[in-house]
A protein has these predicted regions:
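Extracellular "leader-to-stem" segments immediately downstream of a signal peptide or signal-anchor
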Residues: 2-5, 11, 16-82, 87-189, ...
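Folded extracytoplasmic luminal domains of secretory or organellar precursors
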Residues: 57-64, 73, 82, 97-99, ...
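Right-handed parallel beta-helix
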Residues: 105-106, 143-152, 191-202, 214-227, ...
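A generic structural signal for residues located within well-ordered alpha-helices
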Residues: 61-64, 334, 372
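Glycine-rich beta-solenoid repeat tracts in large extracellular/virion proteins
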Residues: 92-95, 112-113, 135-140, 183-189, ...
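Short charge-dense sequence patches
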Residues: 19-25, 98, 168-172, 201, ...
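Hydrophobic transmembrane alpha-helix bundles
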Residues: 86, 116-128, 248, 269, ...
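A short, flexible beta-alpha/helix-coil linker loop
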Residues: 53-56, 266-268, 357-359
Length: 432
């Protein structure tokens, strides 16, 4: 009898999941609940870097030896590059089709703190396609690429961070790219990507940048960059840039910038640039957040985002829960957003304001209106300083927002409902 009851429960659960839909009403594909971690036994031959001349030495630069192992695996039809227990120092590495990265428990791939050890390549950063420094780990046009294991990829960013803040003291308006520094992970133009189990820490710049990729899973990652004693500037945990079908699940994220940021392009004609585009069908679930600037951020270099879900997450001491960055120099449209089943705390619950850092209309006189619509926040138990940190603007329109079943404890619980057109409330408690 108990067995039958269990089967019935499982059946109901599967039926419930099968009925799940994205905010615009389209069904959520079964792919989003297939969360098995990749088995490296299925990925081809194994290439342990110490079998090919690399040595456990945190002070010895070994970029060429590690890259040679990647190239050898590629020449032989693919396989898994294994980082064994120990610390291995490297500059930029480039993975090839059918190659993978596996870090054993106790293994550390450590980035060089000398920028000259990173190649200058055609890449993508901050909503622009340009020449800049490669990341520590790069994979372009590598369908099926995986990073897995229980080891660590350490960006070794402290020297870069200190140099950035020193530059800011001398040149207050310097850009994020003016202080030359690499990202930790950059994956582009690839499908069916999985990153699982590994610690990504201390990135000099963005931690995990995914550009023009479809069907990407980030499972059980630990992503960290400090806010004290030295702030890690622009150390976003995950930047999704023109991506479709992405699952971020069971991850820990604590960085000195946005935890998950949706990118896609910037500038007055950003929506016309073929290198730019939108993000769609993104689910972030069952994650835990430490300090970050925002749990989920739209922008600042973003054009179009649709069907974005943040759910079943715990957030501690963030600056914001949901942040919509509205750039007055970029046409933007954010729609069909769902934030639900969240607990925790942040300075601001909802934050929507014009974002004018490095503002440049480039001479355009007829800048189009930007929009954010069909945003739902529900089933949330949250503590914050400011509940509704939203500003009016003649440069964007906000409409069709829903607040449902909220239990909010806020120092400032005021809400100007007139800012949003068709703003629906149901069972919202603020300081009750």
């Amino acid at each position: 009898m108990k067995f039958i009851a269990l089967l019935f429960t499982v059946f109901i659960s599967l039926q419930t999941f099968g009925q799940e839909k994205f905010p615009d009403g389209t069904p959520i594909p079964d792919w989003f609940r297939q969360n098995n971690i990749v088995n490296i036994e299925t990925l081809g031959g194994k290439y342990q870097i110490t079998d090919y001349g690399a040595v456990n030495d945190s002070t010895l630069l070994q970029t060429e030896k590690i890259q040679a192992v990647i190239d050898l695996a590629s020449q032989k039809g693919g396989g898994v590059i294994i980082i064994p227990k120990g610390t291995f120092l490297s500059g930029s590495l480039f993975f090839k089709p059918r190659t993978h990265l596996y870090l054993e428990e106790g293994a550390m791939l450590k980035g060089s703190d000398d920028i000259s050890n990173f190649a200058i390549v055609d890449t993508r950063i901050e909503g622009q396609s340009l020449k800049y420094f490669a990341a520590l780990v790069n994979a372009d046009r590598v369908d099926g690429f995986t990073i897995s294991g229980k080891g660590t990829i350490n960006g070794n960013g402290e020297r870069y961070w200190k140099s950035f803040w020193l530059r800011r003291k001398v040149i207050p308006k310097c850009t994020n790219m003016d202080e030359l520094r690499p990202r930790l992970i950059y994956i582009s133009n690839s499908n069916d990507v999985q990153l699982s189990g590994v610690h990504f820490i201390n990135s000099p710049f963005w931690t995990t940048h995914i550009y023009r990729c479809n069907n990407v899973k980030l499972l059980g990652l630990h992503i960290f960059a400090p806010s004290v004693p030295v702030k890690a500037p622009s150390s976003d945990a995950v930047d999704l840039d023109v991506c479709k079908n992405v699952l971020i699940k069971n991850c820990y994220m604590s960085v000195n910038d946005d935890a998950v940021a949706l990118k896609g392009g910037k500038g007055p004609w950003a929506d016309k640039d073929p290198n730019n585009g939108g993000n769609s069908n993104i689910i972030i679930e069952d994650c835990t957040y430490g300090f970050c600037h925002s749990g989920l951020t739209f922008g600042s270099e973003s054009v179009y985002n649709r069907n974005i879900i943040l759910r079943r997450c715990k957030i501690s001491n963030a600056s914001r829960l949901l942040w919509l960055k509205m750039r007055p120099d970029t046409p933007q449209h954010y729609e069909y957003i769902l934030v639900e089943d969240i607990t925790g705390s942040a300075k601001s619950f909802l934050y929507i304001k014009p974002w004018t850092q490095f503002f440049d209309l480039k001479g355009r006189k007829d800048m189009p209106m930007s929009y954010s619509n069909n945003v739902t926040m529900r089933n949330i138990d949250f503590k914050c300083d400011v509940f509704f940190n939203v500003s009016r603007s003649d440069q964007y329109q906000l409409k069709d927002f829903t607040f449902e079943n909220l239990n909010i404890r806020a120092k400032d619980g005021k809400c100007d409902k007139e800012i949003i057109s068709n703003f629906k409330w149901d069972k919202v408690k603020v300081n009750n």
